[in-house]
């Protein structure tokens, strides 16, 4: 019997992880699984949470998640994994990052220690015995846990990717719907600034919509992105150094754009099916010079369709789940 899929916490538009939640929700429903998405509040006492696969985020989105010994939990960000001691199985979900250290994590993804489960998804089985686990909240000897390393994906399903969108007439403007930060670990203003300056000098209006101040619907973000003359993704210094692969390039490509990135790791993850330049100012000019390279755009869209949707991620997650049966 198929397990039920439970997406837990972060309703759409309320948190970065709400977008991966939405991707999994759509994908598992498409794959024919009974799929539910619950807010992080007291569980519905009339719902049977046994024999489920839970998918969630443990730092701020799992305060009320029901834990039982018949269900498997795929959780990203775990301040204290001992919270899930009563679960049948816990999988620590991580991004494929190098030298990643923050208030929760201190790890470096090493593919040689892992089993590849699908495009951009890797499984590292737990070690036997206790390990030393330390972060800003815990310093203890605890049992190890299985780990799944992933890259995020586009929010479109394969059959929603419309190749005709590459021919759409664009406006002399760019709408960026995301986060531009001038401080903190994810500071990216210093990389955005030279790109925005090139927009201004070349008659391209740059519009920034802060997703936290003015959250937009998925449809609104996709439409604004498609209207933009370029589909751009500029990573913060920390993202470039840790080689994190986020979802924006995959989304932009799937919406019909030439992929543009200042991250070498994202370029490699796309198997070269996008434009890479570490210099954001030059990336603007590279994008403008190639924005109607329809063969390259088509190849990128096909690559994302085959490798970087949540159908891929859901199928890989199921393979990790089956490793524990």
What kind of region is each of these model predictions?
Residues 246-249, 281, 297:
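Short amphipathic alpha-helical surface patches that serve as generic macromolecular interface elements
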Residues 6-7, 230-232, 283, 296, ...:
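Generic signal for short, ordered secondary-structure residues
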Residues 2-273, 305, 310-311, 315, ...:
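Nucleotide-sugar donor-binding catalytic core of glycosyltransferases
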Residues 259-263, 274-278, 290-294:
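Short amphipathic alpha-helical segments, especially helix-boundary/capping motifs
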Residues 236, 284-288:
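Regular secondary-structure segments
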